[in-house]
């Protein structure tokens, strides 16, 4: 089984932005999300984007006026972010997101951990560790935004085959196997090169996180949960340090 980093290096990074619907579409959605929820600088104007990928959160945050530290394990996705960000105030760091304190500014107004990044952690204990560490690092009235997939209900039989995205030259599908605490995600990517289809395949584990448990972790750490929503299988929470 590949680690998260190996899975992205070997397969996912090369097609990630396309797989997610396209870079500009994701930027548009997150710009609207941050605007709709009044996410703009009010104090130190510093943000840390955990699992930043190619910049779906970091770029809109920087456009809104934040100085952003973007952390991800994928060198290729960070390179894509740097290329797209131009002169925006974004600093990229290649590291495990649990090590964010080693790279963060002294004052932090907002953390984002979106795009299903939270499920990439290995254990519930790591999730709790991250939430408590973020709480300690945030300045007063600081915000944490979580966005992750609800995988508590098991898909069965053929429903475990997910057609993610396809076009005339690329096809991305995945197959899910459920374990007690994790889901094994088997990704299969076909790409047409010189009139021949080439296949890449890899799998890794995602952590199954219930929305209620995640909310309880936030409250236990000291956060006030200001938004709690489930839409199209994605759980979104906005929590504020009290």
Residue positions per predicted region:
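C-terminal lobe and adjacent flexible extensions of AdoMet/dcAdoMet transferase-like proteins
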Residues: 213-242
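Class I SAM-dependent methyltransferase SAM/SAH-binding core
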Residues: 55-100
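Conserved class I S-adenosyl-L-methionine
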Residues: 1-53
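A short acidic, Gly/Pro-enriched loop at the edge of an enzyme's catalytic core
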Residues: 102-110
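SAM-dependent methyltransferase
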Residues: 125, 145-213
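A short glycine-rich, Lys/Arg-flanked "PGG" loop and its adjoining helix->strand segment in the class I
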Residues: 128-140
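A short SAM/SAH-binding and catalytic strip from SAM-dependent methyltransferases
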Residues: 109-125
């Amino acid at each position: 089984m590949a680690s998260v980093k190996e899975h992205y290096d070997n397969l996912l990074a090369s097609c990630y932005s396309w797989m997610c619907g396209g870079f500009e579409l994701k930027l548009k959605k997150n710009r609207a999300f941050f605007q709709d929820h009044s996410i703009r600088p009010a104090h130190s104007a510093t943000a840390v984007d955990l699992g930043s990928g190619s910049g779906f959160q970091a770029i809109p945050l920087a456009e809104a006026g934040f100085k952003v530290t973007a952390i991800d394990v994928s060198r290729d996705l960070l390179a894509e972010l740097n290329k797209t960000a131009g002169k925006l105030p974004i600093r990229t760091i290649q590291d495990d997101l649990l090590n964010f304190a080693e790279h963060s500014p002294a004052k932090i107004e907002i953390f984002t951990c979106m795009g299903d990044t939270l499920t990439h952690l290995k254990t519930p204990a790591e999730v709790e560790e991250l939430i408590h560490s973020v709480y300690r690092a945030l300045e007063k009235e600081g915000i944490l935004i979580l966005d992750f997939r609800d995988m508590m209900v098991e898909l069965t039989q053929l429903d475990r085959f997910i057609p993610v995205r396809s076009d005339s030259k690329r096809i991305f599908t995945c197959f899910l196997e459920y374990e007690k605490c994790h889901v094994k995600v088997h990704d299969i990517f076909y790409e047409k090169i010189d009139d021949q289809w080439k296949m890449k395949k890899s799998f890794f584990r995602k952590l199954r996180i219930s929305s209620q448990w995640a909310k309880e972790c936030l409250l236990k750490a000291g956060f006030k949960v200001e938004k709690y929503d489930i839409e199209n299988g994605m759980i979104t929470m906005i929590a504020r340090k009290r």
